[in-house]
Amino acid sequence: MATIAFSRLSIYFCVLLLCHGSMAQLFGPNVNPWHNPRQGGFRECRFDRLQAFEPLRRVRSEAGVTEYFDEKNEQFQCTGTFVIRRVIEPQGLLVPRYSNTPGMVYIIQGRGSMGLTFPGCPATYQQQFQQFLPEGQSQSQKFRDEHQKIHQFRQGDIVALPAGVAHWFYNEGDAPVVALYVFDLNNNANQLEPRQKEFLLAGNNNREQQMYGRSIEQHSGQNIFSGFNNELLSEALGVNALVAKRLQGQNDQRGEIIRVKNGLKLLRPAFAQQQEQAQQQEQAQAQYQVQYSEEQQPSTRCNGLDENFCTIKARLNIENPSHADTYNPRAGRITRLNSQKFPILNLVQLSATRVNLYQNAILSPFWNVNAHSLVYIVQGHARVQVVSNLGKTVFNGVLRPGQLLIIPQHYVVLKKAEHEGCQYISFKTNANSMVSHLAGKNSIFRAMPVDVIANAYRISREQARSLKNNRGEELGAFTPRYQQQTYLGFSNESENEASE
């Protein structure tokens, strides 16, 4: 009996350890940034000539457009990324779907509501309706609707989309919603082929497809219910055959973005309640971050799906100036969003950086230590140069709004805003991406002894000291005050302040 009891206790202890390990991996703040759980072996990739991308093809729906970047291009395939841009018109509903790969959504413009349906989580929103029936029957019938939390999104929001989690978006504003989606095909959550697959729960993709600069093709795709037998489906769901046919989307030509004529009737708490809920959610988030950073009893480490998964925040605004990581009043601001600030990114294994450069401001040259980067221009123009390990310029051009540039891991990049300034967002293929700067505070030059710099570049110690310290305490975004005139030194330009 003692042996059996000891065996059961050992099994119980192992289960607790496994449970804690899996939850800590997903939600714990102490994540190793040098480790990136992306699959896919090494392949021969040629990044010797980068190019700026724009959407290659578009699919029109009843109330919007989906634009696809060239997923067959070698640069997208080598980085394991897939990018689309969606435009949802007012009162447009992006029908529920889920994907085989995790992703991030950046709201370029517009506002609306969205829902993410996490499996196994309780329905926390409850609403009662009163339905009036025809004469001769009882005058009204009450029924109650329950569903998971509805989130409101606005311009500048980042939305995390874990693989296999159903979601929908609705435009409740007066202007179109424009959103950029970036998916990670090489994430370990994807156990299918390294290709983006959307599983539609409603609607279809039987719409005409326009190839930019090419011929028109037909894009075909049904929702998941269309593949089931009608009788089996109606029996499984407890509905009649007509409803089952509607679920299958037969003869439905609206596409994947449909128009809701009278608008969605959504249950939302009042503004004061929303603020209170947001505050409680932030407190809970901070609480379990502290919880996993401290030593606790094993029995409290695996305390249920609801606390760690169902209440996790799925949306965060990256354009809020108060959230900026670095700010220079004469150059701009940089905001980074990683799993430390946004724990759900441990599931998605992506991160984002929002950069707002003022007039003629320049970024310190840098490289991405542990991730590829996808740079999308939101406003303005930027002069960009990218250099490979061979010291060759693989990109040298001006990026304009709507263009996307893939910057491979370790390639050095230099960006300078044009006279109207520049705003861009970059998506990184690591939940805790890191960059290494060449100039300014906390840079490579600052970390090196003066003699190392002087001998490496055959310059005097005074020149090496100037090279090491001439940017003072500036970090990231630099004011446009230095212009190289000769090999020996630098001279000041006029310092013009630029407003956002």
UniProtKB/Swiss-Prot annotation:
> What PROSITE patterns does the record point to?
11S_SEED_STORAGE (PS00305)
Under SUPFAM superfamilies, the record lists: RmlC-like cupins
Q: Which GO terms describe its biological process?
A: seed development
InterPro entries, from UniProt?
11S_seedstore_CS, 11S_seedstore_pln, Cupin_1, RmlC-like_jellyroll, RmlC_Cupin_sf, Seed_Storage-Functional
Which GO molecular function, any one, fits this protein according to its record? nutrient reservoir activity
Disulfide-linked positions: 45-78, 121-310
- Any idea where the Cupin type-1 domain is? 50-245, 316-465
Q: Sorted alphabetically, which Gene3D superfamilies does this protein's record hold?
A: Jelly Rolls
Q: What keywords are annotated for this sequence in UniProt?
A: Disulfide bond, Seed storage protein, Signal, Storage protein
Highest taxon above the source species: Eukaryota
Leader peptide range in chain numbering: 1-24
Provide the function of this protein: Seed storage protein.
Q: Report quaternary structure and partners.
A: Hexamer; each subunit is composed of an acidic and a basic chain derived from a single precursor and linked by a disulfide bond.
Please give the family membership noted in the entry. Answer: Belongs to the 11S seed storage protein (globulins) family.
Protein name per Swiss-Prot or TrEMBL: Glutelin type-B 5
Q: Which organism is it from?
A: Oryza sativa subsp. japonica (Rice)
The gene coding this protein: GLUB5
